[in-house]
Amino acid sequence: MGLQEDFEEYAEKVKTLPESTSNEDKLILYGLYKQATVGDVNTSRPGIFAQRDRAKWDAWKAVEGKSKEEAMSDYITKVKQLQEEAAALKAVFRAYLVGEMNIFECHIGRLTRCRRGFRTQMKKQIVYSPGTREMNLLSLIKPSLAHVGYCSTYG
C-alpha cells in the first residue's frame, strides 16, 4: 500500500482510539490531518471566545511548513503510538483486575460450573470492581438467577 492508502486507513483507525485519549494528542492528530489534507493554514486565527476552534487552529499552525507526505507519515506514526499505549494500558488494567482484585469472568445462560461459590464470588466481584461495563450488567443479575450462569477465574 502507498502512503495515501495507509493514511486513509489510519484516519479510520483513529476513530477507535479510547475516549481517554488526551486533548493534546487529539490536537496533534488534528493538526497533522489538516496539514496532510489541506496543507498550510489558510484561515485567520479564530477569536478569543472560540477557544476550541482556536486550539485546533494553533495545532494546525504548529505543523505549518511540513509537506503533505511528511504530515501523513507523522500522523500514521502518532496513531500507531496511541494504539500501542492504549493496548498496553488495557493489558496492565486487566492484569491488575485479575491479579490484585481476583476478578472473574461471568457468563449468563450457561450451566453452572461452580454452583456453591457463584453467589459469593459474584458479590465480591460487584464490590471489588464497581463501575466497569461488565459490572453494570452483573449488578442487574438477581441472586436467584445464579443457576443460569457460570463463573471461571482467570489465570
From Swiss-Prot:
InterPro entries: Acyl-CoA-binding_prot_CS, Acyl-CoA-binding_protein, Acyl-CoA-binding_sf, FERM/acyl-CoA-bd_prot_sf. GO terms for cellular component: cytosol. Induction: Down-regulated by cold stress, wounding and infection with the rice blast fungus Magnaporthe oryzae. Pfam families: ACBP. GO terms for molecular function: fatty-acyl-CoA binding. An acyl-CoA binds at residues 15, 30-34, 56, 75. It is found in: Cytoplasm, Cytosol. Highly expressed in leaves. Expressed at low levels in roots and seeds. Residues 3-88 form the ACB domain. CDD domains: ACBP. The keyword Ribonucleoprotein does not apply. The keyword Membrane does not apply. Its main location: cytoplasm. Keywords: Cytoplasm, Lipid-binding. SUPFAM superfamilies: Acyl-CoA binding protein. One of its GO terms (biological process) is fatty acid metabolic process. Belongs to the ACBP family. PANTHER family: ACYL-COA BINDING PROTEIN 1, ISOFORM A (PTHR23310:SF62), ACYL-COA-BINDING PROTEIN, ACBP (PTHR23310). Binds medium- and long-chain acyl-CoA esters with high affinity. Can interact in vitro with linolenoyl-CoA. Binds phosphatidic acid (PA) and phosphatidylcholine (PC) in vitro. May play a role in the biosynthesis of phospholipids. This is Acyl-CoA-binding domain-containing protein 3. The lineage of its organism: Eukaryota, Viridiplantae, Streptophyta, Embryophyta, Tracheophyta. The gene is ACBP3.
